[in-house]
From Swiss-Prot:
Protein known as: Uncharacterized protein Rv2226
Domain of life where this protein originates: Bacteria
Signal peptide location: none
CDD domains: CYTH-like_Pase
A GO-annotated cellular component: cytosol
SMART domains membership: CHAD, CYTH
InterPro entries registered for this protein in UniProt: CHAD_dom (IPR007899), CHAD_dom_sf (IPR038186), CYTH-like_dom_sf (IPR033469), CYTH_domain (IPR023577)
Occurrences of domain CYTH (ranges): 11-219
Domain called CHAD: residue spans: 228-506
């Protein structure tokens, strides 16, 4: 897999599906104010082969991957969930490689399929009659499709002897109603009005999320037979939810979405914090491999994250200064330099996200979640509480006070950073166990000292860049100005810490009552 995979075209699909019987008559859209005319489109014959892993991992994540011929949009289509009635469709053209999935689409879902084979699981043939609904301005508003569907599971169109766990052939009729979106927005009120016409005509909301889901036996989006149930224990449920979030942010990082690297790193550290504070409950040892791997992943993502944060920070600070105070090549060195470092860090992150090492980490996380979901009541360990995590925060706060009284700035900053890390762990554990007020107060400390740590990193970087600028004979006035602003920010954070710690202590005491 290349480090720089091509970016596939994206399209927001907003649609609803409906089940209808053979005798149901297509609806009329007359009388809907937004619709001024309806045009019949040429009949289409669509033939699609759907691809997935042997265990249908894509389908379990409400994702479909198909190679379709026929119609105006023939090609490879990857559809990802994007909210109620919405999916993000990514496309790639057909090629001479036949059933080889395009690299740019496979890369998007690599964290789900990993190194498993992606192979045909179903073939669906659709005879489509469609109508385009137009508005007063002449723009297309929506498309109504009347589909007669014939579908075969994998064994029915593979060579003799291939496995087939479902019926050889299925036939049904369904309607689709899709908004025509050009700017990424959707008029859900219009969709509701149009959908009511379909319901009035005798249709029913589809009992499946997609044609493929119906072939595979799913009755609702993302549901497949024998799918894992969410863990009952709150901490294990929190880990399960964060693993799901990790896969979502993985896709965003691959798309280079803004703040995605940062959020994936945050999610990675949440999982690590929850596992670290619940090692016995998960059957992990102090030096558990999975915890170490999560730390390594966060470190790799941190290169791009730090550069992105610094670049945005310097951009805001420089924009806020009067023009005469921005001297020399300071913007080029601080902002443009951060953006270059971000791209370097992103490439490093993508290499890591395409590695066998990363796939094995994801396998291990899946196993942890699955094992706890199927644990019997006799295997349950003592419930996780906030007590141990809070004791670590208090210990770190006491050490920070000693460091502030006896040591220099470096030791003080390290001690404050330790408080932040332990407050973060307390926050996640408290949130998972229902101690919401404790979680909120811990978040205040985490944010406060996060700003302090960003200031520490920023000042170190400003010194380095000021030295480089001075060596090059450039004006260094602005570097000094920004440095002082960062120092003032750090001082304000330290001044607010004591009050924040008192509020946290009060919240913990109340949670224990």
């Amino acid at each position: 897999m290349p480090v720089e995979a091509p970016r596939p075209a994206r399209h927001l699909e907003v649609e609803r599906k409906f089940d209808v019987i053979e005798s149901t008559v297509s609806p009329s859209f007359e009388g809907i104010a937004a619709v001024v005319r309806v045009e019949q489109s040429p009949t289409q014959q669509l033939d699609a082969v759907y691809f997935d892993t042997p265990s249908h991992d894509l389908a379990r994540n409400q994702i479909t991957l198909r190679r379709r011929t026929g119609g105006a949009d023939a090609g490879w289509h990857l559809k990802l969930p994007a909210g109620p009635d919405k999916r993000t469709e990514m496309r790639a053209p057909l090629s001479a490689s036949g059933d080889a999935v395009p690299a740019e689409l496979l890369d998007v879902v690599l964290a789900i399929v990993r190194d498993q084979p992606v192979q045909p699981v179903a073939r669906i043939s659709t005879h489509r009659e469609s109508q385009i609904l137009y508005g007063a301005g002449g723009d297309a508003l929506a498309e109504f499709c009347n589909d007669d569907v014939t579908a075969w599971s994998a064994g029915a169109f593979h060579a003799a002897g291939a496995a087939d766990n479902g019926p050889a052939e299925q036939q049904w009729r369904e309607w689709e109603l899709e908004l025509v979106t050009t700017d990424g927005t959707a008029d859900t009120k219009l969709l509701d009005r149009l959908a009511n016409r379909l319901l009035d005509a005798g249709a029913a909301p589809a009992g499946h999320g997609s044609k493929l889901a119906r072939v595979l036996g799913a009755t609702s989006p993302g549901e497949l037979p024998n799918g894992p149930q969410p863990p009952a224990d709150p901490v294990h449920r929190a880990v399960s939810e964060q693993v799901e979030q990790l896969l979502l942010w993985d896709r965003a990082v691959r798309a280079d979405a803004y703040d995605a690297v940062h959020q994936m790193r945050v999610t990675t550290r949440k999982i690590r914090s929850l596992l670290t504070d619940s090692q016995e409950s998960f059957g992990l040892k102090e030096s558990a491999w999975v915890i170490d791997e999560l730390r390594e992943l966060a470190d790799v993502l941190g290169v791009a994250r730090d550069a992105e944060v610094l670049g945005d920070r310097y951009q805001r600070e420089l924009d806020a200064l009067a023009p005469e105070l921005v001297r020399g090549r300071v913007r080029e060195r601080l902002v443009d330099g951060a953006r270059r470092r971000y791209q370097t860090g992103l490439r490093r992150s993508l290499i890591a996200l395409r590695s066998q090492r990363y796939f094995r980490l994801l396998d291990a996380l899946d196993a942890l979640v699955s094992e706890r979901a199927h644990a019997t009541s006799g295997e349950e360990s003592a419930p996780v509480t906030i007590d141990a995590a809070y004791r670590r925060v208090r210990k770190a706060a006491k050490a920070a006070k000693t460091a502030g009284d006896q040591a220099g700035d470096h030791h003080r900053d390290e001690a404050l950073h330790l408080i932040r890390k332990r407050a973060k762990r307390l926050r996640y554990t408290a949130a998972a166990t229902g101690a919401d007020n404790v979680s909120q107060e811990a978040k205040v400390i985490q944010t406060l000292l996060g700003d302090h740590q960003d200031s520490v990193v920023s000042r170190e970087h400003l010194i380095q860049q000021a030295i480089a600028a001075n060596t090059a004979g450039e004006d260094t006035f602005t570097y000094g100005l920004l440095y002082q602003q960062e120092a003032d920010l750090a001082e304000r954070c330290r001044e607010q810490l004591e009050a924040a710690l008192r509020k946290l202590d009060k919240a913990v005491r109340k949670a224990r009552d």
